[in-house]
A protein has these predicted regions:
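N-terminal Rossmann-like FAD-binding beta1-loop-alpha1 element of flavoenzymes
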Residues: 4-31, 409
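Glycine-rich FAD pyrophosphate-binding loop
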Residues: 23-47
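A short alpha-helix-loop-beta-strand transition element characteristic
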Residues: 44, 67-88, 155-161, 265, ...
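Dinucleotide-binding Rossmann-like beta1-alpha1 core, especially the glycine-rich loop
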Residues: 48-128, 132-136, 145
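Active-site/ligand-binding neighborhood in enzyme catalytic cores
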Residues: 124-226
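Mid-domain catalytic core of redox enzymes
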Residues: 225-332, 340-341
Length: 416
C-alpha cells in the first residue's frame, strides 16, 4: 500500500498539512506546486533589504490548528499591540485592547469611537464568546456581520469608526456582509490570543510545515493544466498517473467539471512604501474609518518586527480593498492620502512594490468550522482540500488539510 502514487496539488497550508498527515500514516506523497516556493497565498519576498509579505497577513496565536502544527517559540513571533490607531479628520488617537479589555479602554479615546454603552456591550460580547465553543459559533444561523452588530445594539458610531474599518481589513469586503459566524470566531480568537507575525515574515509558517516533511517530494514550477480520472496533465504537457489526487488549490482551476461552482474570490491590493521613520512608532494597525478613503488600513511592519527592514528606513504596508486606478495613479493617490493622515509630504513615501492579490480569500455563503471527511471525496481517486471548503482563514486551511488526508486514509480501509 505504501508504494501508492499520491499527488497533492498545491503547497499551500492545506497541501502541506495533508502531506504531514499522510507521512504519519506511512505514505510518501508528491506535491505539485505551480510557483517556486511553498506557502500558497502565504509568501514573503525579499526586496532591497525589506521583507514583503504577499498581502498584509497575521497569524492568530489562539487558532487551534496553529497550536497543533506550529512550534510558536521557534517562529520567534512578534506580536501586535491589541487595538488600533484611528486616523480620522486630521487627527489620530489610540484605542487600546477593545476586543479583550474594553472596560479598561481610556474614556476619552473610546468616546470618539463609541458610547459608554458600546464599551459595556463590547465587554459582554467578549465574555460570551470566551465561553462559546467554536463548534457552537459555526452552528449559529448565518446573518451578515453588519446586521449582527446592529442587532446586538452597538451604536452607529462604533460600527463606523471601529468595527467597519477593522473587520473590512480581515474580511476584505466593505459592507460587512460576511457571516457573523466568522465575526464571532475571529473576535473570540483576538480576545484569547495575539495577532502576530514571525520575526522573518509570514513565509516562515509554511517553511516550518515543510520542515516537518521527510519522505514527501515537492516539485516546484509545476503548474497543473487539468485533472481527469486518475490522470494529471501538467502545463508542460507531461501526464502523471495517480492512485489518489488531493486538490489543495481552487479546484475549478484544474477541474473543468467544477467551473462556475465557486463565487468570485475576494481581492486586495497591498502596496509597500519606505519612509525615513514610522509616524506611528508602535506595533499597531492603523485604521481609516469612513467610505471616502482609498486606503483601508496601514501598518509599519518594522514597528512589529525589526527584521522586516534591514535598512535605516521604515517599511509601510498599505491595504486597498478596491481600486480601478492604474498603478501609477493608485500609488500617487495613496501617497496623497498618507500625507493627509500623517502630515508627511507625499513624495517622502518611496514606493517599493504593489501586490494585486486576486484570490486573497474565498467567497463563501456558508461558513463552517469543519465538515464530515466524506465531503472531501469527489470520486474514488480525487479529494478536495482548502480553506474554500470551510472559511477564509489560515486555521481553516490547515483544518482542511488534515480532513482531506483523513479522507484519503479512510479510502484505503477495506470497507471503503
Amino acid at each position: 500500500m505504501k508504494d501508492q502514487k499520491i499527488y497533492i496539488i498545491g503547497a499551500g497550508l492545506s497541501g502541506l498539512v495533508a502531506a504531514i498527515e499522510l507521512e504519519k500514516a506511512g505514505f510518501s506523497p508528491v506535491i505539485l506546486e505551480s510557483s517556486d516556493k511553498v506557502g500558497g497565498r502565504m509568501k514573503t519576498d525579499k526586496v532591497d533589504g525589506y521583507l514583503l509579505d504577499h498581502g498584509f497577513q497575521v497569524i492568530l496565536t489562539a487558532y487551534p490548528e496553529v497550536k497543533r502544527y506550529l512550534n510558536l517559540p521557534a517562529l520567534n513571533l512578534k506580536t501586535f499591540d491589541p487595538g488600533a490607531v484611528i486616523f480620522d479628520k486630521n487627527d489620530s488617537y489610540i484605542i487600546s485592547d477593545p476586543l479583550r479589555n474594553p472596560l479598561k479602554v481610556v474614556g476619552m479615546a473610546f468616546s470618539r469611537v463609541g458610547t459608554f454603552l458600546d464599551k459595556v456591550k463590547m465587554f459582554t460580547l467578549t465574555q460570551e464568546l470566551k465561553k462559546k465553543s467554536i463548534e457552537d459559533i459555526f452552528n449559529e444561523p448565518s446573518v451578515p456581520t453588519l446586521q449582527y452588530l446592529k442587532n446586538y445594539g452597538f451604536s452607529e458610531l462604533i460600527i463606523s469608526n471601529f468595527f467597519k474599518p477593522f473587520f473590512r481589513g480581515i474580511f476584505l469586503e466593505k459592507h460587512l456582509n460576511t457571516s457573523a459566524r466568522m465575526f464571532e470566531f475571529v473576535f473570540k480568537m483576538f480576545s484569547l490570543g495575539h495577532a502576530a507575525v514571525p520575526e522573518k515574515g509570514m513565509q516562515e509558517i509554511p517553511n516550518m510545515l515543510k520542515q516537518q516533511l521527510s519522505t514527501t517530494q515537492i516539485y516546484y514550477n509545476s503548474p497543473v493544466e487539468k485533472i481527469e480520472g486518475q490522470s494529471i496533465t501538467l502545463k508542460n504537457g507531461e501526464v502523471l498517473e495517480a492512485d489518489r489526487i488531493l486538490v489543495c488549490t481552487q479546484p475549478d482551476h484544474v477541474m473543468p467539471q467544477m467551473q462556475g461552482q465557486f463565487g468570485k474570490p475576494k481581492q486586495v491590493i497591498n502596496l509597500y512604501f519606505s519612509l525615513q521613520k514610522s509616524f506611528m512608532a508602535r506595533p499597531m494597525i492603523g485604521l481609516l474609518p469612513g467610505d471616502n478613503h482609498i486606503v483601508n488600513n496601514i501598518v509599519f511592519m518594522d514597528d512589529v518586527s525589526e527584521a522586516y527592514s534591514s535598512n535605516d528606513r521604515s517599511l509601510l504596508s498599505v491595504s486597498v480593498l478596491e481600486s480601478d486606478l492604474e498603478e501609477k495613479q493608485l500609488v500617487k493617490a495613496v501617497q496623497e492620502e498618507l500625507e493627509k493622515i500623517s502630515g508627511v509630504k507625499a513624495e517622502y513615501f518611496k514606493f517599493i512594490r504593489a501586490y494585486y492579490i486576486k484570490h486573497a480569500l474565498p467567497f463563501l455563503d456558508d461558513m463552517k468550522a469543519t465538515i464530515p471527511i466524506t465531503e472531501c471525496k469527489i470520486t474514488d481517486h480525487i479529494f478536495l482540500g482548502g480553506d474554500y471548503l470551510l472559511n477564509g482563514s489560515s486555521n481553516a486551511a490547515m483544518t482542511s488539510g488534515r480532513l482531506v488526508a483523513e479522507a484519503v486514509l479512510l479510502s484505503y480501509t477495506p470497507t471503503h
